[in-house]
């Protein structure tokens, strides 16, 4: 059979050539028969139009009415980020009252990290960074001693950093010490832990026996203690129990403890826990302002907000780990928002995926939802937000000047832990034509600036109105179980640095000419860290 003839007659070059090449007989093309078309059938058209009109008058029910409602994208993300906990009782704790569980059952001896007072700050920092789930190094007098004399954590590292780069302005009695530490750091001399003990206020050391019951730890944590030491009968430290570890325990094992599990279904609004006295910082303030704020107020984290007071991120003392490389020192002069982007980028590299941890809840969130986020983010607190406020689109320049000059002493104002430096945090006024903000809060203070357009802000969270910490949650657990924890404000006051000590609010003030690269020798920490974000 002639291929060209078949192709020409078929009118379909592709199909005919393919079939002819295989030696398959090709039938002649089918002619379109006009009688088969409805184009010449007016009656059919009329019937079709009538049927169409009837369908419009009485449309059939939508199949969507019979479909199960789908999860919203936000609900799906929440489910992925916080999967349901195991609903099967743990044989180890089933049928037991949590107050009958001993502290030693939660001890993990492998998590204890030791250093002696003569160890250098650099070496102690490496112990703190590398695979340390407790985020603390226990310090003893000598390598052979088993008695804990102090601790070294990220708050201490933050205090040391501020002294080294010349941002802390000490009291008169500490001027010589601060100058000596700065001089040794620039000369790349080892600085032992013994010499930096007075740089930050220490939390009270609380030790409990491994044979003590969990209610004693609960009472301590509900009183504001962040961690306790677990000791053996011989007095040796065999573990460190933190607030996070205990909250995580009750979250994972809640099915075994009905009294605790019932609380998880309650709304934060109904439980009335947390505080509405908030300390926050604006997103375009220098990172050093956030570090100084945490140091002077004894905080482990601070909310970063835009001009509409919408939460755009969170900076914690643990994030200081990203500043222990000499190459990262220029970040100190960058904005808080820029540092948040560095934190997110670092998380993405560590976990192999993009991540945006959520550090906020709302008054209608359940306690269980809040605890799930605390456990997932390993954070000490969740910011409570309401519906997002519009964020103005304007250059990132302050609308207001600080209430006092940068070099003037700070006047005390009321904050979460007592007096706060009003030169560093002020409440921006609302525009005259703006609606009244929901739930106006007394003593609520913030820094001032305008969020640049395009940066994440209002659409990510909402207006900051309060905060719920692990101390608040464990205090609730303790009181609901008949315990009597003391007032957490006593521990908060202890962690605060003396308000009489002044600090420089910005690198753009008296020390704007600091050469950070000349300070980088103070660290000498040129290594790549692989450790769990907390």
UniProtKB/Swiss-Prot annotation:
<feature type="domain" description="CBS 4">
    <location>
        <begin position="335"/>
        <end position="391"/>
    </location>
</feature>
<feature type="domain" description="CBS 2">
    <location>
        <begin position="199"/>
        <end position="259"/>
    </location>
</feature>
<dbReference type="GO" id="GO:0005737">
    <property type="term" value="C:cytoplasm"/>
</dbReference>
<feature type="domain" description="CBS 3">
    <location>
        <begin position="274"/>
        <end position="331"/>
    </location>
</feature>
<dbReference type="GO" id="GO:0030071">
    <property type="term" value="P:regulation of mitotic metaphase/anaphase transition"/>
</dbReference>
<feature type="compositionally biased region" description="Low complexity">
    <location>
        <begin position="388"/>
        <end position="403"/>
    </location>
</feature>
<dbReference type="InterPro" id="IPR000644">
    <property type="entry name" value="CBS_dom"/>
</dbReference>
<feature type="region of interest" description="Disordered">
    <location>
        <begin position="388"/>
        <end position="447"/>
    </location>
</feature>
<feature type="region of interest" description="Disordered">
    <location>
        <begin position="1"/>
        <end position="45"/>
    </location>
</feature>
<keyword id="KW-0677">Repeat</keyword>
<protein>
    <recommendedName>
        <fullName>Protein SDS23</fullName>
    </recommendedName>
</protein>
<dbReference type="GO" id="GO:0005634">
    <property type="term" value="C:nucleus"/>
</dbReference>
<dbReference type="InterPro" id="IPR050511">
    <property type="entry name" value="AMPK_gamma/SDS23_families"/>
</dbReference>
<feature type="compositionally biased region" description="Low complexity">
    <location>
        <begin position="9"/>
        <end position="27"/>
    </location>
</feature>
<feature type="compositionally biased region" description="Pro residues">
    <location>
        <begin position="428"/>
        <end position="441"/>
    </location>
</feature>
<feature type="domain" description="CBS 1">
    <location>
        <begin position="107"/>
        <end position="172"/>
    </location>
</feature>
<dbReference type="Pfam" id="PF00571">
    <property type="entry name" value="CBS"/>
</dbReference>
<dbReference type="InterPro" id="IPR046342">
    <property type="entry name" value="CBS_dom_sf"/>
</dbReference>
<keyword id="KW-0129">CBS domain</keyword>
<dbReference type="GO" id="GO:0042149">
    <property type="term" value="P:cellular response to glucose starvation"/>
</dbReference>
<keyword id="KW-0539">Nucleus</keyword>
<comment type="function">
    <text>Involved in DNA replication and cell separation.</text>
</comment>
<keyword id="KW-0963">Cytoplasm</keyword>
<comment type="similarity">
    <text>Belongs to the SDS23 family.</text>
</comment>
<feature type="region of interest" description="Disordered">
    <location>
        <begin position="481"/>
        <end position="509"/>
    </location>
</feature>
<dbReference type="GO" id="GO:0004865">
    <property type="term" value="F:protein serine/threonine phosphatase inhibitor activity"/>
</dbReference>
<dbReference type="InterPro" id="IPR016711">
    <property type="entry name" value="Ssd23"/>
</dbReference>
<feature type="compositionally biased region" description="Low complexity">
    <location>
        <begin position="499"/>
        <end position="509"/>
    </location>
</feature>
